[in-house]
C-alpha cells in the first residue's frame, strides 16, 4: 500500500488512535481531475470522495504538529491508498499489520454523506469468469455465448433482495469485459 503516514507521540509501543482519509479515487488515471468554481463552490471529480477529507486531515495533522498537544497515546494521521476498486482496503489492512494491537480506535473520514458510520465496513471483491466453447457466429450458431451466460448471472444477482436491518449491504457489477470480434461467439466473459 502507498500510505502517507504522520505519527505524533506514537513511538515505542504506546496505544494509537488512527485518523485517515483515502487518496485514491474511483476515476481512472485517464480522467482529468480539473477543478472549477461556480457560485463560490468548487467542483472536481473526487472532491467529495475523498479529496476534501484529505485536506481536512492535513489541516488536523498540521495543527497537532504546530501546537504539540499533550496526549495519553499516539496519534497517527494517514492518507491511505488502495481503498477504491481492486485495492479492496489494502491501505487499511497495512495499517492493521503495522500497528496491530496498539490500535485503540480508527476514525476514517470518507465521503460526504450526512451521517456517521460507527462500525467497521466489510468489503469483498469478486472476479467472475464464464468460459464456453465459443465459435464462429455463422458456422457455430447455437453454441453457448459467454456474454449471454454472464448477462443471465448479472440479471439474477440484481434480483436478489437485500435483508432488512440496520447493516447496509450493497453489491455492484462495475466492469464487464468479453468477446474478441463482432463475428465470433464469445468464449469468455468476466465481471468485477
Question: What is the role of each PLM region?
Answer:
Residues 1-43, 63-66:
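Acidic/His- and Gly-rich active-site-bordering loop/insert found
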Residues 21-26, 111-114, 121-123, 176-179:
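Short glycine-enriched loops at secondary-structure junctions
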Residues 24-37, 103, 118-129:
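Acidic-glycine-rich active-site phosphate/pyrophosphate-binding loop
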Residues 39-48, 134-137, 179-180:
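A short glycine/serine-rich beta->alpha loop
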Residues 41-42, 46-125:
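Acidic/histidine-rich catalytic neighborhood of metal-dependent amide-processing enzymes
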Residues 45-52, 138-146:
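Short alpha-helix boundary/capping segments
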Residues 130, 184-188:
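Short, flexible turn/loop "capping" segments at secondary-structure junctions
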Residues 140-185:
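Acidic-enriched catalytic cores of C-N bond-cleaving enzymes acting on peptides and small amides
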